[in-house]
UniProtKB/Swiss-Prot annotation:
Keywords: Disulfide bond, FAD, Flavoprotein, Heme, Iron, Metal-binding, Molybdenum, NAD, Nitrate assimilation, Oxidoreductase. Homodimer. Residues 1-71 are annotated as: Disordered. This is Nitrate reductase [NADH]. Mo-molybdopterin binds at residue 188. It is an enzyme of class 1 (oxidoreductase). Heme binds at residues 571, 594. It comes from the Eukaryota. One of its GO terms (biological process) is nitrate assimilation. Residues 1-10 have a biased composition (Polar residues). FAD binds at residues 706-709, 723-728, 735, 740-742, 793.
Amino acid sequence: MAASVENRQYTHLEPGLSGVGRTFKPRPDSPVRGCNFPPSSNHELPFQKKQNPPIYLDYSSSEDEDDDDEKNEYVQMIKKGKTELEPSIHDTRDEGTADNWIERNFSLIRLTGKHPFNSEPPLSRLMHHGFITPVPLHYVRNHGPVPKASWSDWTVEVTGLVKRPMKFTMDQLVNEFPSREFPVTLVCAGNRRKEQNMVKQTIGFNWGAAAVSTTVWRGVPLRALLKRCGVQSKKKGALNVCFEGSDVLPGGGGSKYGTSIKKEFAMDPSRDIIVAYMQNGEMLSPDHGFPVRMIIPGFIGGRMVKWLKRIVVTTQESESYYHYKDNRVLPPHVDAELANAEAWWYKPEYIINELNINSVITTPCHEEILPINAWTTQRPYTLRGYAYSGGGKKVTRVEVTLDGGETWSVCTLDHPEKPTKYGKYWCWCFWSLEVEVLDLLSAKEIAVRATDETLNTQPEKLIWNVMGMMNNCWFRVKMNVCKPHKGEIGIVFEHPTQPGNQSGGWMAKERHLEISAVAPPTLKKSISTPFMNTASKMYSMSEVRKHNSSDSAWIIVHGHIYDASRFLKDHPGGVDSILINAGTDCTEEFDAIHSDKAKKLLEDFRIGELITTGYTSDSSPNSSVHGSSSISSFLAPIKELVQTPTRSVALIPREKIPCKLVDKQSISHDVRKFKFALPSEDQVLGLPVGKHIFLCATVDDKLCMRAYTPTSTVDEVGFFELVVKIYFKGVHPKFPNGGQMSQHLDSLPIGAFLDVKGPLGHIEYQGKGNFLVHGKQKFAKKLAMIAGGTGITPVYQVMQSILKDPEDDTEMYVVYANRTEDDILLKDELDAWAEQVPNRVKVWYVVQESITQGWKYSTGFVTESILREHIPEPSHTTLALACGPPPMIQFAINPNLEKMGYDIKEELLVF
C-alpha cells in the first residue's frame, strides 16, 4: 500500500469570456477538473465591453505550456460534466414560498423543509464530478428568501473609514478593476453536523458530509476596492471590514445578513479575497449570490456574504445579529440558555474564521455491498475520499485505519491545484488507498484522519458544541457481513449518518438502541411531548384547516395545536416556512429542523389538542405518543361524534388521500396505464380541468412527490387513470438513475396504496373557451396547444373536456413533440379525435429522429415555420397552451410564439 503525493498544476489561461482574462489552466493528465469555461448558451453575460487585463494568480513554478489540443480536451471534460446533469426546474416544493421563481436541481437534499432553501448534493454525485462541482449541485445555505436582483440596478457601496466613499455599479466592478479567477473550496461550518445531533441535538439542522463544494470564482480583489476608496489607517480606527447583504431576515427582530473580518485580512494580498461576480464561467446563480458576493478563500462559508450591498470599514466588528448568533464554537458545557444568559455569543475567542482540518470517506458509499467471492478477493478494493484544511494550508497526509487506530496506512494524495505565489492551497484534495478485501472482511470499521502542513490533525472523538459546528472527528464507516444473494456473503458499509431527515447510518442505529435501553415502559410527562391534559381545549382537523393564513396560522405537531400567528415576524426561518404549513400537520418537518430549545419555545404557543384516536401524522406514520395510551379510550366517544360523512369529492386541499392500485396495463415497453381506486366508490376525484395532482411515495427512505395529470375524465366515479412513461435506469445518459417515481409506479403490485395530494396548478378550464388563470378570466375560440413528451397529458385533459361538451365549439390545434414515434403518448386517441372532428381538432407531430419509413410529419425540433403552418395566428380570441420540458418552453416555444406576434405574457398559458 505505497503512498505518494501528486501536485496537479494550473497555469495562466488565455483571455476567456468577453475579453476577461482567465487565470489558470489544468494539466491534461489531471482526472479531476479545472477551469477555462466556454460561454454558456443560457447564461448570457450582461457585460460585453473591453475590460482591464486580469491580475493573474502568481505561482511558484514556471508556466506549463500546454497546447490547444490539451485545453480543448479539458473543455470537453467540463461539457461532459454538464451533460450528466438533469436540468434545473421550478421545484414543486418551492410552490407557495418566496423562492418559487428559482430553478433548482431536484436531486439536492433539502435539510430545512420547504423554506428557506438549505441543501447539499448526494455525496456520491458530488464526488462523481471530482475537483470542480457543477453549480446546480453546489451546496446552498440560505437564511431566508433569495432577493430578486437586477444587474443593471445593483450597486455596492464602500463607506465608513475611507477617504472617498463610493458606490460601484456592476459594470464598473467588471470594467474598471482588474479581476482574479481561481478555484476555491467553500465549506459550511456545519458540515457533518448531523453526527453531533446524533449525540445531542444542537440548535442547527442536519448537514451531512456534502456541505462542501469547489467552483471557479472570478471577481475584483477586495483590497483594490478599498484602495480606490482610500481606506484609512489603523491609527485612525480602521480595524475591521464589514460586509452586508440585501436579504432582510427575521433574526434579532429584523436585520440583514452581515459579518466582518479584520482589516489586516482584507488588505493581505496573500489571502486572495475577492468581490465575486462569476462562478464556473457564468454569472452567479440566485442561490449563490447574484449578482455579487464575497469569496474569502480558506474561511468558512458564513463569512462570504451573498447579495453584497455594502462594505463598511469600521473600528468595531459587524453589529449584525448573524455575526454574533451564528458561526461560533462554544465550549461543550455551554447550551443555548447559558450562552444567552452569560453572553457567550459575544466573546471574540469563540468566533470561527478559518476552516479546520477535515476528511471524509466517500468510497465505499453508504449501504454499498461488496460481494466476497473468488473474483473480488483476487484484487484490492480502493477506498476514496476528500480532505481539506483552512487558511491556505496544504493537506500533507491522510491515513486510514482498519483496527481502531492501532495501525495506520498512508494514502495517496491528489492535489489538483498548484500553490499560489504565497504557497497557499485554497481547494480540497482527494485521497485513495488500496486495501485487501480479506482485510476488510476481518475488520469492523474504516476510519480516516488528515493532517495539514502545520501538523494539525483530526481528533479521534467528536467534541459537541451547541451550534454543531466544525465537526472534524475521525470519519468512520462501519462494516457488517451480509448475504446479498443466496449462497453468497458480502460486506455492507454504513456511514455514520444520512443528511437532513433521511434515515440510516450507524449512529442513528446506536442512538435508537440507547433510547430503547433506557425507555420507561409507561408514558412520562415532558415538555417536548407533554401528557395530554383532558381539560385542554379540543379542536377537530376541519377547524384547524381554517386557520391557514397570516391572520391566523395554526399548526399541528405531535397531535398538539399551536397558534403561530404572533410568532410569524420573529421566526428565524421567515414567514413563508410557517404559512406554507399553516392549517396542517407539520410534525415531520418540525422535528427534522428544530432543536430541543425550539420545541420548548413552541409550548408558549400551544392552544389545544387535536380530536383523534391513535393519532398519526399526515407525513410521519406512527410518530405520536398517543397511539397506545389511555387517552385513546378517553377520546374514542368524542371521535364518533365528530366524524364527517363520506365526501363526494376525494381530493382534500393540503391533505393526502390514500388510493389503491386496482389495474395496470402495459401499453408499450415503457408506457403504462394505471388505474387507482378512490377512498370511496361514490366519489369523484375532484380535480378541475387544467389542474394536476401530486403522487407521494417513500422511495429509498425519502419522500418523493411528482406531478401528474389524469387521463380519465373529471366525472369518473370511484377511480382515476394515469398514462405514465417509465424512465428506466441506465437508458438515458443524462438521467442514469432513471425516473424515481415512474420506476416506483412500475414496481407497485396490484393492491398497493399511493398517497395523492391536490388539486394544484394555476390554470383551470371552465368550459366553452373560458379559463381561470391565477384568478383572472381569459377566453379563446381557438387554442394553439403545444406539448412535449409527457406534457401532452394536461393538453389531453382540456381537449377531452371540450369534446365531451356538445355546446363547446372551441377549436384546437395541437403540435406535439417527442424524441421518436415510439415516445408519442395517447396517439390513437389524438388521431381518433382529429378524424372524428377534423374541423375542430388538428394534430401535428414533431420527432427528433424518425425510425419509420414514410413518416409524414415533421422531423427535428419545434420551429417558427412549423408553428406558423400548424397553429392559428395570434388574435384577441386565441390562446396558446404549452406543457413540456423547461428548455423546450424557453428555447422553442417562447421565442417562436413571439416571432409570430403572440404576447406570451398574456396569451401563453404554461401548465
